């Protein structure tokens, strides 16, 4: 059996931990650049707000109902996510952090000694007590069914936070009630194909013969079908393995000069390299893209992208940044006011075991790897970007995103530590 532990309205829940006076009140978290709503509490949904709403279009509702508005703070959310995962590991041996707000738990063997529902309720209560983050839990023989169970646990209070799908009767009832478009692994194209063949519920899909599924769908579709029938076959570590990593931003202000673009692209490249090291992976291709503001018809429009291949997979910040800046120089055009840029690293491979290349222009890779370790250690201890490349520039720059409502980094920055007696 598997359990899927899903943090409820995670971004908003984290903000409420540090602003307890917001309990029971509408709260929303905005996307980068404070553009649109990416997370909201049930109270915010009740007054007519929706995920994806541009904030300027719902300003009257936000102000009229005194909605608490926060800018996204991924450093704070990631730190709290790590705490939730660590708490899970105090009770369950095999825990896989699938996303920032979801973790899979392998419960194999626990059913012989515990009532799984009561056990997971105790785990959920511990998470709530230690972090104040509410969670919903789904338990089932496959990960897809466990994700489905967590949705039911979140939607229906009668489950008291934990929904277990452990019999064929429960499985079929869940498949009948669940929305096919919400099934993990069923994207838009697959949904359209299934609908074309008269399949409108997960139960319709699960009841199809194996031969039909194999003849009409690709391997992921077959895996989803097996999972819906209670047969676990999805290796989430494979699903999670990134094929590309992208860091991009819409600028807070339009940028025209090359130096500012270099600073932005260097920051994005550095972020990609940091993510690669976190996955113990390296990339062999670096892509940079630029675009003007398509909503400003009075300005000249331009967009372009180009790539550079590397000799060997790397996660070295300096190497990736240098490659990105070379690409930027090729696609930059003077006289354009740029609104967005980004860096993509691809052709990602595990860094270990490392295979040296005879023609590698960097001959001191072991020493460079130690330098990157030192860079990461300093930034982990003293705060992100404490140590950075000179080309990345100062912390405050015009191109950086708007984040007028961002909370301090209470858990990762000594300057953001909350003082006892602070008013909320």
Where are each of the predicted segments found?
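Short, hydrophobic beta-strand segments
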Residues: 103-109, 305-311, 355-360
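Gly/Gly-Pro- and Ser/Thr-rich, intrinsically disordered tail segments characteristic of DNA damage-repair
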Residues: 1-226, 236, 365-424
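Short Gly/Ser/Thr- and Asp/Glu-enriched loop/turn motifs at secondary-structure junctions
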Residues: 98-102, 140-143, 281-285, 336-340
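DNA-contacting surface of Y-family translesion DNA polymerases
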Residues: 182, 190-337, 353, 424
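A general secondary-structure junction signal
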Residues: 139-143, 290-292, 342-347, 391-393
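Short, charged/polar surface micro-motifs in flexible loops or helix N-caps
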Residues: 10, 33-36, 293-296, 348-352
